[in-house]
Amino acid sequence: MSSSLETIVFSDNFDGGLDDNWSWLREDEKNWRLADGGLEIMVEPGLADTVKNALVCPAPDRSQGTFAIEVTVYNHTLPTQQYEQAGITWYNDGKPVFKEVKELIDGDLYIIPGKQPMPTKSVRLRLIVTANSWEATYQPEGESEFKVAATGELPPPQNDQVSIQCYHGPEGGEHWIRFEDFCIKKIS
């Protein structure tokens, strides 16, 4: 839900280059590109703690209010590998502690957490965070409202970072994920 009270803290539409606030975890230059106002990353094998081409930026100071982190995720190629996924990951003191992703599980696509069915190629993810909690919401392609997937707790803030990433791709596969219109908003 967008309102006039929301303030953009950081945004990147990936048009013409990456903003200086970004940095890479385990960058593999040949497997990411900027194209037509989007960031495209090839889904490579790996796990949360070994993910390649994870684009990371400083997270907002959760003690200063409620924030929403948003990005649109589009599958160029439908996932085929069990647990193949793309979306937002929250890091706390250098460790991945939470993810909101579009993920293939047993042949079907879901929004995780919450295991909400996700049949569309494109989805807008919106992770809302406070000093101690998160709410994972999503807006499927063609819909106007965000739906709540799940809620939970976050550890106390400690060098928090936000990442957009994809992993668990097939060996030798050419599965590309497109990220568009990343933003962090202060919503209260």
Predicted regions and their residues:
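Extracellular glycan-recognition regions
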Residues: 1-188
